[in-house]
């Protein structure tokens, strides 16, 4: 299989973002989003997905974190789509349940070529530190729209907002790792009766 790597730059009047992604990495992260809690969460995707990822971001954080969080999701989605390519010879589907103490989340993904986000998550608190956890929806929406995947995120239980968020991101990493994994029995074929997952 060819190297599954990508680099994306996204520059607007609101944000300047560079993302590099290697799907066949070892869980190495170099994350500089300007938002420490977001770095911590994306690190969970990297470590549990066994991806290598670098993110350098500058945004209008003096106004709000919204643009930065959403645009990082967009750039990461673009990098993911480029790295995974035509999806020939991969599993396509992935799922994971991840607990952390009292919290339990389930993530299911289909590299379908059709963007769709189901975000069935309730956070008991609006913030962790000074990070607005409502922005996680914007992060995943940006990712889904540009990765062209269907993603279901469900929190099954939990009372600690940090724990809930961490289980979501860990499960997302593990589900994506499963979905992009090579399937030798596919013999390089695209896992769809349509013969394509890019149209």
Swiss-Prot record:
Gene3D superfamilies: Imidazole glycerol phosphate dehydratase, domain 1. This is Imidazoleglycerol-phosphate dehydratase. GO terms for molecular function: imidazoleglycerol-phosphate dehydratase activity. GO terms for biological process: L-histidine biosynthetic process. It catalyses: D-erythro-1-(imidazol-4-yl)glycerol 3-phosphate = 3-(imidazol-4-yl)-2-oxopropyl phosphate + H2O. Belongs to the imidazoleglycerol-phosphate dehydratase family. It is found in: Cytoplasm. InterPro entries: IGPD_sf, ImidazoleglycerolP_deHydtase, ImidazoleglycerP_deHydtase_CS, Ribosomal_Su5_D2-typ_SF. It comes from the Bacteria. The keyword Kinase does not apply. Pfam families: IGPD. Pathway: Amino-acid biosynthesis; L-histidine biosynthesis; L-histidine from 5-phospho-alpha-D-ribose 1-diphosphate: step 6/9. Keywords: Amino-acid biosynthesis, Cytoplasm, Histidine biosynthesis, Lyase. The keyword Cytoplasm applies. PANTHER family: IMIDAZOLEGLYCEROL-PHOSPHATE DEHYDRATASE, IMIDAZOLEGLYCEROL-PHOSPHATE DEHYDRATASE HIS7. Its main location: cytoplasm.
């Amino acid at each position: 299989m060819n190297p599954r790597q990508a680099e994306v730059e996204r520059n607007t009047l609101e944000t300047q973002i560079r993302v590099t992604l290697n799907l066949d990495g070892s869980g190495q992260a170099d994350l500089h989003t300007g938002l420490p809690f977001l770095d911590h969460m994306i690190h969970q995707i990297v470590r549990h997905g066994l991806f290598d990822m670098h993110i350098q971001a500058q945004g209008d954080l003096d106004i709000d974190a919204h643009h930065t969080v959403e645009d990082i999701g967009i750039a990461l989605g673009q990098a993911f789509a480029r790295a995974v390519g035509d999806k020939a010879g991969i599993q396509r589907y992935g799922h994971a349940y991840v607990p952390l103490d009292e919290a339990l989340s389930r993530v299911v993904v289909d590299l379908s070529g059709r963007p769709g986000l189901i975000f069935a998550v309730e956070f008991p608190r609006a913030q962790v530190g000074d990070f607005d956890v409502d922005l996680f929806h914007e992060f995943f929406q940006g990712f889904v729209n540009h990765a062209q995947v269907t993603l279901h995120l469900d929190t099954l239980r939990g009372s600690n907002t940090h724990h809930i968020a961490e289980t979501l991101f860990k499960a997302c990493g593990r589900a994506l790792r499963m979905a992009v994994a090579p399937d030798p029995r596919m013999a390089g074929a695209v896992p769809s009766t349509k013969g394509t997952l890019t149209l």
